[in-house]
Amino acid sequence: MSMVKSYVNPDQALQEVQSGNRVFVHGSAQTPHFLLQNLAAQKDRLRNVELVFITVKGDVCIDRPEFQDHFHINCLFVSESVRAAVNEGRADFIPVFLSDIPDLFRNSMPIDVALLQVSPPDEHGYCSLGASVDIARSAVNHARKIVAQVNPQVPRTHGDGLIHVDQLDQMVFHEAPLPEEDYSIKSGPDELKIGTIIAGMIDDGSTLQLGIGTIPD
């Protein structure tokens, strides 16, 4: 990969995406909305671009009917943001264990371009994948090209979640708040009652595994 010399505008950075490409999209709190919005604006030059991700947060815009000839979502988890598109047949779902996704990227679903949202580089040139490392680590390792939205509001997290600027083909600077979830508005009386009952069964010091949905929330 080429050494990044400076930040570029999103129009230039997203020229890395071409028709027929498979594109990984960073997910959850790291959803790169600025890149997705600018990619949507380039739809007229693109056909059959496959977008792969687990969960994305907020309005993904490119899941709308007017984009279906240009972008096709192939999600690895049906999150709220794309549920309507999957139900209406405008997007597909690949049922797969989370632990098997790195093998998919390595052998069955090669990634042409990865769209990330990362922290600014530190003094050693390392950016952080922030709050969503999960399958992004594997996507980074196997993508042919990497385009990163650099956002000062992305937290630096420890562990195997760093990427050096030498690995980035394009960097776009855009500061914006990360997507957030307000769980307080999703839980009703039934969920709260279930949670109260379960809480009474948990000993102090226990380790909990929590899933996704209104009850664990």
Regions found by a protein language model. Give the residues of each.
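Conserved alpha/beta enzyme-core scaffold
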Residues: M1-D217
